[in-house]
Swiss-Prot record:
This is A-type ATP synthase subunit D. Has multiple subunits with at least A(3), B(3), C, D, E, F, H, I and proteolipid K(x). Belongs to the V-ATPase D subunit family. InterPro entries: V_ATPase_D. The keyword Zinc does not apply. NCBIfam families: PRK00373.1-3 (NF001544), V_ATPase_subD (TIGR00309). The keyword Transcription does not apply.
């Protein structure tokens, strides 16, 4: 590719300037990559913590639910569940983390359905299961938000790494090769010009010497 570059001093100056600029851009991208990795480690740690908490809470919900099934019967519980229309809603928005758009998700607590049963007439395990599930909802939503955030950060990290790879593998070699090519041609021309000048000086010197005899 270097051979397609016009070997002039102006191009040499421009290519050197562009090489310095590209080096600065690469350094900025590397800094961005480090910051993204730092955010990813932080959010991954939070995700693991919340995931474990949700896992424990859902175990409690399931245990209470199984005990409620044993007391009330699966058909009665299914009938109560089917009597409820889907009503849960979440409020979502976008926030920016180091130039990366990530979602924020919040549960609209007013849309949580009321108990479709009476605490007096049904098993206390059913009420316990409902309360535990209601408490777990916020953490489940938080888990979803963290997962979406991590995916967005990973996507941006991959884009950044691809740009760095492109600079390392294609752009920098092109500019360095072009600069080397131009320098070599200019140096060769300079040597040729120097040789011509020496020859001309010798010729002139001989003429002067011949004229003085």
């Amino acid at each position: 590719m270097s051979q397609k570059v016009l070997p002039t001093k102006i191009n040499l100056i421009q290519f050197r300037r562009q090489l310095r600029l590209i080096t600065v851009i690469k350094r900025l991208l590397e800094n961005k990559r480090e910051v993204l990795l730092l955010y990813l480690r932080t959010y991954a740690s939070q995700y693991e913590k919340i995931y474990n908490e949700v896992n424990e809470e859902m175990k409690k919900v399931y245990e209470s639910y199984l005990q409620a099934v044993a007391s009330e019967g699966i058909s009665n519980i299914e009938e109560m569940a089917l009597s409820q229309k889907p009503s849960l809603e979440v409020n979502s928005a976008i926030k920016v983390i180091f130039g990366v758009k990530v979602p924020t998700i919040r549960l609209d607590k007013s849309t949580i359905p009321a108990k479709p049963f009476s605490d007096v007439e049904t098993s206390p395990y059913l009420s316990e299961s409902y309360e535990e599930m209601t408490e777990a909802l916020n953490k489940i939503i938080e888990l979803v938000e963290l997962e979406s955030t991590i995916r967005s950060l990973v996507s941006e990290l991959r884009k950044t790494q691809r740009l760095i790879n492109s600079i390392d593998n294609y752009i920098l070699p092109f500019y360095r090769g072009s600069i080397k090519f131009i320098k070599q041609i200019l140096e060769d021309r300079q040597r040729e010009e120097f040789s011509r000048l020496k020859i001309i000086r010798r010729i002139l010197q001989r003429r002067r010497e011949s004229g003085s005899r």
